Amino acid sequence: MARVPEPTSEVMSYGYSDNENDLFFEADGPGKMKCCFQDLNNSYLEEEGIQLQISHQLHNKSLSHFVSVIVALEKLKKISVPCSLPLQGDDLMNVFHCIFEEEPIILEKCDDNAFVHDAPPRSLDCKFQDINQKSLVLYNSYELRALHLNGTSVNQQAVFRMTFVQEDEDITKIPVALCIKEKNLYLSCVMKDGKPTLQLEMLDPKVYPKKRMEKRFVFNKTEIKKKVEFESSQFPNWYISTSQAEAMPVFLGNNRGGHDITDFTMELSS
C-alpha cells in the first residue's frame, strides 16, 4: 500500500505541524513541498517529481495514512514544481495503477423467489354475483353457496379479498387468489375422487397472502364486457361455477358456456 513520504526536517522548519497529514490538509499546502521527495531511493513516475514509498508494516498504519495518499495527490496538482509538464489526471491514474490491482467481480444469479416478500401484493376487496344475480354466501363455515338475497339478508353476502399474484401464464389472463375476508378462508382446487374439486382452506394470515401462491390457490381471471370468470391454474379449463338451482354449493366445473354458470359480476367493497 502506498503512502505519503514522511516530511523531512527541512519541511518541519517552515513552522508546520509535526503531523504529516497537516502538510496536505493546509488550505494552500506548503510552498516547498518538493523537498519531501528528493532524498528517497524509490522509483520516479515519468520524472514528474512524484515518488511512492512502499510500506511493509501495515499493522501500525491508521486510516488517515491511507487517506493521505489521495489528499496529497490532489494537493500536488495545485503545487508549483519545476517540471516540464504540469501534473495531469492521467498521471494520477498511473500512480493508482501501480498501487492497486484490478480484479473482476463475478455476480451469481439471484433467486427471484428470495425477494417475493419485499413488498406486499396488491389486493382488492370485492363481492361477486353470478349472471343470474345470485350472491355468494359462506354456509356452515367451510362451504360457499349461491343464492338470491334481498332486504336485510344482503348482509350475508361474502366479501372477498382478491390478491394479484405472480404466475407464468398467458398474459391475457390475470392470476389472482381469492380469500373470504375476515375468515382467512382461501378458495383452492384439489383432486378428490378423481375429479378437480373446489374447497376452502384456512391459512395463516402472518404468511398469506404472498406474491407466489401455491398453484392450487391461483385462478386466472378473465374479464369480457364487465363479466369475469375464474379458471383454475392447477386444472386448466376448469372454472369456478354455480348451478342454475337456488342455494346450491359453488363448485369447480368444466362446462363453460353450458348449463352451469361461469360468468360473474364484480362489485368493489369499501
Curated annotation (Swiss-Prot):
- Per the UniProt record, the site (Important for interaction with integrin) maps to K173, K181, K183, K192, K206
Instruction: State the Gene Ontology BP annotations.
Output: cellular response to lipopolysaccharide; cytokine-mediated signaling pathway; fever generation; immune response; positive regulation of cell division; positive regulation of immature T cell proliferation in thymus; positive regulation of T-helper 1 cell cytokine production; positive regulation of type II interferon production
Swiss-Prot/TrEMBL keywords: Cytokine, Cytoplasm, Inflammatory response, Lysosome, Mitogen, Pyrogen, Secreted
Any Pfam family hit? IL1_propep
CDD domains, per database record: beta-trefoil_IL1B
Propeptide, residue positions? 1-118
GO terms for MF: cytokine activity; integrin binding; interleukin-1 receptor binding
One Gene Ontology cellular component: cytosol
Cross-referenced PROSITE patterns, in alphabetical order? INTERLEUKIN_1
Q: Where in the cell?
A: Cytoplasm, Cytosol; Secreted; Lysosome; Secreted, Extracellular exosome
Q: Indicate yes or no for the key word Membrane.
A: no
Q: Which family is annotated?
A: Belongs to the IL-1 family.
Please share what else the UniProt entry notes about this protein: IL1B production occurs in 2 steps, each being controlled by different stimuli. First, inflammatory signals, such as LPS, stimulate the synthesis and promote the accumulation of cytosolic stores of pro-IL1B (priming). Then additional signals are required for inflammasome assembly, leading to CASP1 activation, pro-IL1B processing and eventually secretion of the active cytokine. IL1B processing and secretion are temporarily associated.
Quaternary assembly: Monomer. In its precursor form, weakly interacts with full-length MEFV; the mature cytokine does not interact at all. Interacts with integrins ITGAV:ITGBV and ITGA5:ITGB1; integrin-binding is required for IL1B signaling. Interacts with cargo receptor TMED10; the interaction is direct and is required for the secretion of IL1B mature form. Interacts with HSP90AB1; the interaction facilitates cargo translocation into the ERGIC. Interacts with HSP90B1; the interaction facilitates cargo translocation into the ERGIC.
Q: What role does it play?
A: Potent pro-inflammatory cytokine. Initially discovered as the major endogenous pyrogen, induces prostaglandin synthesis, neutrophil influx and activation, T-cell activation and cytokine production, B-cell activation and antibody production, and fibroblast proliferation and collagen production. Promotes Th17 differentiation of T-cells. Synergizes with IL12/interleukin-12 to induce IFNG synthesis from T-helper 1 (Th1) cells. Plays a role in angiogenesis by inducing VEGF production synergistically with TNF and IL6.
- PANTHER family linked to this entry: INTERLEUKIN-1 BETA, INTERLEUKIN-1 FAMILY MEMBER
What protein does this entry describe?
Answer: Interleukin-1 beta
Q: Which organism is it from?
A: Mustela putorius furo
Q: Which gene encodes it?
A: IL1B
